[in-house]
From Swiss-Prot:
Region annotated Disordered, chain positions: 47-70
Protein's UniProt name: Interleukin-25
Residue stretches of biased makeup (Basic and acidic residues): 61-70
Primary localization class, coarse: secreted
A Gene Ontology biological process term: inflammatory response to antigenic stimulus
Subcellular location: Secreted
Source species: Mus musculus
Consequences of knocking out this gene: Mice display mitigated inflammatory responses and Th2 responses in house dust mite/HDM-induced asthma model.
GO cellular component term of the entry, any: extracellular space
Organism taxonomic ancestry: Eukaryota, Metazoa, Chordata, Craniata, Vertebrata
Known role: Cytokine produced by various cells such as eosinophils, T-helper type 2 (Th2) cells or epithelial cells that plays a role in internal safety of adaptive immune responses by regulating cytokine production. Promotes and augments T-helper type 2 responses locally or systemically. Exerts its activity via its receptor composed of IL17RA and IL17RB for signal transduction. In turn, stimulates the JAK2-STAT5A pathway and promotes the secretion of type-2 associated cytokines including IL4, IL9 and IL13.
């Protein structure tokens, strides 16, 4: 269980970044350093931990990609296999987030590991990740590189899960 939690935390983009954020810094322009202070180097160079997801697979639903492997990473052994797509934004912390993309419209049969089972649908599982966007501070004149951090929730697909289809009455 702990391995799955650690794996999902890694994919969500849990990065350790040291930023000097003033208390109550979620609104513009209170985030900006005073004129005597230089902007922290971290604000100018956003760094994020290097996360290497498994190799992305094909972007279409092919029968070959709709197989559950017997070994390998979690995303390829699942009955709702998925691949990862990189979402990079240089003005966001973390800069790199990986989204899961379901490889099959239906779930892979547990009996065969290769045939799709139309009784289950493969759907993404989402999480709202807290991210920070770097924005120029309002009211600052000149060519100073001063930035404010704007906190937002960002929807990230973590994995794909097998669910029963919804029945419309």
């Amino acid at each position: 269980m702990y391995q799955a939690v650690a794996f999902l935390a890694m994919i969500v983009g849990t990065h350790t970044v040291s930023l000097r954020i003033q208390e109550g810094c979620s609104h513009l322009p209170s985030c900006c350093p005073s004129k005597e202070q230089e902007p922290p180097e971290e604000w100018l160079k956003w760094s994020s931990a290097s996360v290497s997801p498994p190799e992305p697979l094909s972007h279409t639903h092919h029968a070959e990609s709709c197989r559950a492997s017997k070994d390998g990473p979690l995303n390829s052994r699942a009955i709702s296999p998925w691949s990862y797509e990189l979402d990079r934004d240089l003005n966001r912390v973390p800069q790199d987030l990986y989204h899961a993309r379901c490889l099959c419209p239906h779930c892979v049969s547990l009996q065969t590991g290769s045939h799709m089972d139309p009784l289950g649908n493969s759907v993404p599982l989402y999480h709202n990740q807290t991210v920070f966007y770097r924005r120029p501070c309002h009211g600052e004149e000149g060519t100073h590189r001063r930035y404010c951090l704007e906190r937002r929730l960002y929807r990230v697909s973590l994995a794909c899960v097998c669910v029963r289809p919804r029945v419309m009455a």
